Amino acid sequence: MDTSFRDGFQSVYGARVLTPDFLPALDASVEAGITHFEAGGGARFQSLFFYCNESAFDMMDTFRAKVGPDANLQTLARGINVVALSQQPRDIIDLHAKMFKKHGMTTIRNFDALNDIRNLQYSAERITAHGLKHEVVITIMDLPPGCEGAHTPEFYLERLQLLLDKEVPFDSICFKDSSGTANPRKVYATIKGARKILPADTHIRIHTHDTVGCGVAQYLAAIEAGVDGIDLAKNPVSGGTSQPDFISMWHALKGTDYTLDFDFEKILTATEVFEECMKDYFVPPEARQVTALIAVSPMPGGALTANTMMMRDIKTLHLLPKVIKELPEVVRLGGFGTSVTPVSQFYFQQAYANVALGRWKKITPDYGDMVLGYFGQTPVRPDPEIVKLAEKQRKKAIYHGDPLDLLEPGIPAATRKLEEHGLPSTEENIFIIASCEGKGLDFLLGQSKVNVRKQSATSQLN
C-alpha cells in the first residue's frame, strides 16, 4: 500500500497538507500503476478541519474521483476513538463507518492502542455492516529496557487468538508498529506464528516507520515469515519518521525470490512529480532522520513531528531531548500500552509534564484515566503507586468495565449544537461536530483559518 498521502503527510508535515497541492502527485501515482492507497483517517481527518480549512469528506471524494472506481482506498481508525482523539459512543462509531463508505473508501484499518479486544468488537461489526472491508490490527513495539510482561510474539499471538475466539469480523489483519521499534526477529516470530493460527487464505500485512532505521529489516523479516503486504511511501515523505521508501525496498529485495509489483521507471517519475508538489512545505529536520534513541524511548513517527511542531509553537523545543529520555519511565509505569495514537500522546504529555513540572508532580488527565482503566485494559497492570496518584489527582476510582458503557449517545448532542448555530443537521456535519468538537464547529461556521507550514514567510498561510 502507498501511504504517502496519509501517513506520509502525517509523519512528515504533521498532517497539514492542502488537497490541491498533492493532486498532481496522486495522478502520477495512478499513472505508475498503484491501485492501493491510504487516503485518509488518522490525523488526516481532524487536520483538514483544524489546519487546512477543508472538509475531509470533500478530500475523500476528490481522492476517489482521481483514482477511479476500482482502487482500494484505505483509511485508519482508532477503535472506539474512530478518527477522534476522544472516545466516541456507539452511534458515532456507526456513523463513522457509514460516512466513510459514502465518501468512497474501501477498507478501514482499525486498531486499539491497548490491544483490548473489547475496543475493536463494535467498530468491527459496524465497518463490515456498512459494506467496508475491515483490516483489524494488533499494535506492536519493543518495550524500553527493563520492561517485561507484554509485547512479545506470544503476547501478540494470544491477542490474535482472542480476536478469533470473540469472532471479531475482519477481512485482513495488520501488525502495526507505529514507533518502528519492534526488532526484526520479533517481527519474524510474530508473523510466522500468525500464519499457523490463521486460515491459509488470510491476508496479513505489516506497517512500520523508519524512525529507528530498522524499517527495511523489519519488512525483510516479515516477508521471510510469510507476510502478504507491506506499506511504503515515496520521497519526500519516506524514511525517517515515515514508512520505508518504494525504491529502498525494491533495492533491498534484489537477489531474493521476491519483488514489488510496480514499474520502477514510473515510480521514479511519480516521485519527481511528488517532490515538485511538496517543494514549498516545511520539513522538520527530525522528520527525515534516524533517531536511534527512539528504539528505547518509543514515540511514533506520526506523533513525533506533531509534537515537535507544537513545541516549536510554544518555544519549548529545547526540552525535547529530556522528554524523549523520560518516555521509558512513563511507559514502564503506565501498563505497556502500545505507543500509538492516542496512547503515544498520553505518554508524551506525561513525559513533558515530568520534565517541565518535576517527575510525577502532576498526572496528566489522559494518562491518569488510562492507568485507571477508562480507556480499556492495559496489557499489564500499571504501577500501583501511579494508580494511587491518579485516583487522588483525577478524583476517580479504578474502572474495570467496557469504556463504551460510559458514553452517552453522540448524535443528539451534536444535532443540538448544529441547531443552536443555525447549521444543517446533515450526517456529515453531525460527525464533524462529534469528532472535531469546537474546531469542527469553527469550520462549519466559516471561522477556521489555514495554518499550513511552508518554507517562506510569503507562502506560509496563517
Model feature map: region roles:
Residues 1-7, 13, 35-39, 71-78, ...:
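Hydrophobic faces of well-ordered beta-strands that scaffold small-molecule active sites
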Residues 8, 110, 173, 226, ...:
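Conserved, mostly hydrophobic/aromatic
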Residues 24, 28-48, 286-462:
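Terminal or standalone catalytic/regulatory effector modules within metabolic enzymes
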Residues 41-161, 177-180:
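Active-site beta->alpha loop and helix N-cap motifs at the rims of alpha/beta catalytic domains
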Residues 60-68, 121-131, 188-199, 250, ...:
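Surface-exposed amphipathic alpha-helices with a cationic face
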Residues 92, 151-158, 212-227:
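Catalytic cores of alpha/beta
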Residues 110-113, 177, 225-242:
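Glycine-rich phosphate-binding active-site loops on the catalytic face of alpha/beta enzymes
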Residues 238-260:
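C-terminal helical cap(s) of enzyme catalytic domains, especially alpha/beta-barrels
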